[in-house]
């Protein structure tokens, strides 16, 4: 999760009226989102999941007050309807994980993260995920329909394919904001389907109807499997500025019960920091031996 995207998340959560609650980041890395939470969100309880053992242990050291599980998301057992907010950059790939609660849907990893997180968030709570454009642009609408039946699309922002170049990736990505419905509904909203723009490029209907939420220019480019659509950056524009403008266009309000933040007893998997090390700071350390 890049720092720019983290700032967008925080800004939009503030715009939606979120102050404090239970926050989940299910693929957290070292936890960029947790760093520098605004003062009005600092009372939130933080929960994270990270598969990589070294990265996960680092996150536990940096955020000793957070509940961070170092394991696959499919191996976690958070209760349903528990989190007020879920954020993160979901893994993407043409592979699947075993989770008996979702195996019947045959989800790929990125779709699985959406489905499981929807169940873990309270009705009225918000999910904000970065995902490959495949989530919104894939030809088969079944996963989008699954999501739409359970959540309301508040908005989406399409990022140019160089947005995460510092992480060594060149892929068109979307930031998607969803609000969990109170109940399952049968719906056929526009964003479930694809359409074509004036240049004949196929993409999600949401972006056809909201071209200002595409922070670049959609073009056909050469990909690993032939020609494919991509959002290419436009010269002379600041992505950070365009992100700030785009997020202001997303409307909605988080609506959750004003209950106390959970203090449920969870197994403490954190690593004690050495004396004198401040929270949300870095230090040199010797990591424990990790047997794979």
Predicted regions: what they are:
Residues 10-16, 22-37, 71-101, 111, ...:
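Conserved proline-anchored active-site loop of SAM-dependent methyltransferases
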